[in-house]
Amino acid sequence: NAISISLNSETFGEILDRLKEVLTFIDGKINVASGDSMTTLKYRFESEIPPVTQLKLKIETNCREHFAELGWERKYFTVSSEWYKGECFITTYKLEELLGTKLRALYQRRKGRDLYDFLRAFQQHSLDTTAILQCYRKYMEFSVGQVPSKKEFLLNMEEKMKNENFIGDITALIRPEEKYNQEEAFELIKKELIEKM
């Protein structure tokens, strides 16, 4: 998944056209859907790593949340792959804000890959957990009006950890040789974030 945000409430058509243009290197079927708060591009294609499976790339653009709790950041970005080489500066969130929205997603949906993202973020960066929780609360209040209690969040996660779809959804997304333990990721998030709610 890729997630982007519209920085203001202007129309999104020009950006959508540009996204489709730069993603022409993906061989596969594209589907575009627009709603009140989200525009979604979905691509279907085959994996390059055996066993070959059908994969989906979903690019969601949030067209409702036009704010950054911790302020915007300009980052240098470069890509060098078999398909594309390029560089630019992008306007993005601070990492803690991205993880605050990821924590909201972890609560609201059944995607075990969110735990994987947290584990990698904690392994690779020194993070301000207070800022992550501040952003989580802000985005929960904005989207649903109420922030779940620590107990509610923990019960939600304990139920998800029993769900095979939640546990197994990361399998096709990581290389077979990569070592990943979902329980370890959950324990880390519990200690670093849930217990501090």
Regions found by a protein language model. Name each.
Residues A2-M197:
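Structured mid-to-C-terminal alpha-helical surface segments
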